[in-house]
Amino acid sequence: MYKRLFISRVILIFALILVISTPNVLAESQPDPMPDDLHKSSEFTGTMGNMKYLYDDHYVSATKVKSVDKFLAHDLIYNISDKKLKNYDKVKTELLNEDLAKKYKDEVVDVYGSNYYVNCYFSSKDNVGKVTGGKTCMYGGITKHEGNHFDNGNLQNVLVRVYENKRNTISFEVQTDKKSVTAQELDIKARNFLINKKNLYEFNSSPYETGYIKFIENNGNTFWYDMMPAPGDKFDQSKYLMMYNDNKTVDSKSVKIEVHLTTKNG
């Protein structure tokens, strides 16, 4: 009897160790923010147009490119030209760490991301706080090209549900040609829609007090980005876009997106 009890306890202890040591969905999931966790547009006294610029048709987009250089160990430089405004012909994307940069260094990739100019450095000779001519910077936004596109140029629709003051007021879809797509690409497309349809960002302010965009993956994991700038009178585009440096990707067929907004009079 004692032997059987001992064996049962050993099995129980082993099972507990296995549960503790095995990553689980809830542990990896980012909980929804509390109201005090979010930036408030009323506490930002700068120009909201600087935020709007990041999501209003000024993004970097390129297919089948390969890095040609780097500045630091955790970034990659590509020959990508601005076909619309002719503002740049080189793009540097900064990643979370050196390992992530090495992963894509010699790969043929697609690049899609929001870019900035001030505090964009390609070498130690670039002037601090100045715009480097012909060059622009971004974070993340990389996906491997080979095998990551749908057949016959098909596109995948991704559902976005918008909640204003906790009420679902509008739903729409954004499209991507990628099987594995960066959250940044979907975020840009969702916010661009909301700028055009809901005036998400205006020149001086926003009709919304708080906002966050939430991604729900097929395994139940969730994560979100704050959609408003930090309090103060200045908006640092580089610092804000840094949230994309982990190059987070999602499965375009299964991911769901929610946008949660509160109005200033709500």
UniProtKB/Swiss-Prot annotation:
Keywords per UniProt: Disulfide bond, Enterotoxin, Metal-binding, Secreted, Signal, Superantigen, Toxin, Virulence, Zinc
Cysteine pairings via disulfide bonds: C120-C137
Keyword Disulfide bond set for record: yes
Keyword Disulfide bond: yes
Compartments where located: Secreted
Protein name: Enterotoxin type C-3
Pfam families, per the entry: Stap_Strp_tox_C, Stap_Strp_toxin
GO molecular function: metal ion binding; toxin activity
Species whose genome carries this gene: Staphylococcus aureus
